[in-house]
A protein has these predicted regions:
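Glycine-rich beta-alpha loop segments
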Residues: 7-10, 14-138
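Conserved active-site loop/cleft motifs that coordinate metal ions or position small ligands
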Residues: 4
């Protein structure tokens, strides 16, 4: 039987899920435009406020190993939605033409290797491959 205490806990959980900076029920994979929403290449400071950075900062502020029950749930729901979106993506895209390059926020966008990865990704895309990245917060 659901008690009044349970209902209050559920309400707190739903309130928390509404305030995270990412969509816990995203139905499609993120595009570069979505991830860099708010970023203006002519204004380096705008990177601090783009979507990708906001999500990463949220991740850091709530702990790499989350100890907040609601945060743990929000991450699991988001991961599940991305997993589902990836399965949908592969229904219409040949896995043999998909390439993933994993990295992290430690590599600065001004680093020489970052530029090399961007140019490699650009060339592979021009050759008809789909570039997939991710797996990390923000």
């Amino acid at each position: 039987m659901i008690t009044e205490t349970d209902i209050k806990r559920f309400e707190r959980t739903f309130d928390y899920l509404k305030q995270v900076p990412y969509d816990i029920s995203k139905e499609t994979l993120y595009t570069a435009l979505e991830l860099y929403n708010g970023y203006n290449p002519d204004n380096a400071d705008s990177f601090k406020t783009c979507f990708d950075t906001k999500v990463y900062n949220h991740y850091i502020s709530t702990g790499k190993i989350d100890t907040i029950e609601e945060e743990s749930l929000s991450r699991m729901l988001h991961d599940h939605s991305i997993h589902t979106a990836l399965k949908e993506f592969f229904k219409t895209h040949n896995k043999q033409h998909c390439i993933g390059i994993m990295g992290g926020h430690a590599l600065q966008r001004t680093d020489y290797m970052y530029k090399k990865i961007v140019l490699l990704s650009k060339r592979l895309t021009e050759l008809g491959f789909y570039m997939l990245s991710g797996g990390g917060p923000g």
